[in-house]
Amino acid sequence: MLPPAIHFYLLPLACILMKSCLAFKNDATEILYSHVVKPVPAHPSSNSTLNQARNGGRHFSNTGLDRNTRVQVGCRELRSTKYISDGQCTSISPLKELVCAGECLPLSVLPNWIGGGYGTKYWSRRSSQEWRCVNDKTRTQRIQLQCQDGSTRTYKITVVTACKCKRYTRQHNESSHNFESMSPAKPVQHHRERKRASKSSKHSMS
């Protein structure tokens, strides 16, 4: 048996030895993991990969296509300033109104239509439906005409205040065109039938 004094001196020595052993194990563990863990190679990540990870891949591109399909169409409004005349009477002040004879184009194309070719290429890919600019809103306006003899006249006229785009199908246009082209021929045929009927009645009477 060792005396108590020796135990008192051996206890700190044992603690020092245990700390050195733990430090040796920690150093070995750190060196071991430094060999196992490999540095991640710096690969340049493309924008398409990031978009697929964050936005669901192809779903993002489909939403872009859906936005392009919902194209709002606008009408180019032409403003007109003119005088109204009736014989020797002319309006005192000029009349300003809208003329709905412009072109119907997508709203995103309208600002860049003059001098830009994007609108022409885009609108050439339209479907079998055509858009026309027609009158949307009108109002009645009174105007005064000044005559050469000093008298004045008051007229009521209809003024266009807004235009809109109306969709027509090509089949509708072709059918109306065929109807208009065939309509003048009908009275001629009817006129010939009348001549033949009159001739036959004359022969029967003779």
UniProtKB/Swiss-Prot annotation:
Cited PROSITE patterns: CTCK_2
UniProt-recorded Gene Ontology molecular function terms: BMP binding; BMP receptor activity
GO annotation terms (biological process): canonical Wnt signaling pathway; epithelial cell fate commitment; hair follicle morphogenesis; mammary gland bud morphogenesis; negative regulation of BMP signaling pathway; negative regulation of canonical Wnt signaling pathway; negative regulation of cell fate commitment; negative regulation of determination of dorsal identity
Subunit structure as annotated in this protein's UniProt entry: Interacts with BMP2, BMP4, BMP6 and BMP7 with high affinity.
Matching Pfam families: Sclerostin (PF05463)
Organism per entry: Pongo abelii (Sumatran orangutan)
Cystine pairs: 75-133, 89-147, 100-163, 104-165
Any GO CC annotation of this UniProt entry: extracellular space
Positions bearing carbohydrate: 47, 173
Keywords: Disulfide bond, Glycoprotein, Secreted, Signal, Wnt signaling pathway
Region described as Disordered: 176-206
Domain CTCK stretches: 75-170
Principal location: secreted
Function of the molecule: Directly antagonizes activity of BMP2, BMP4, BMP6 and BMP7 in a dose-dependent manner. Enhances Wnt signaling and inhibits TGF-beta signaling. May be involved in the onset of endometrial receptivity for implantation/sensitization for the decidual cell reaction.
Official protein name in the record: Sclerostin domain-containing protein 1
Family per record: Belongs to the sclerostin family.
Cell location: Secreted
Composition bias, Basic residues: 188-206
Secretion signal, residue range per the UniProt entry: 1-23
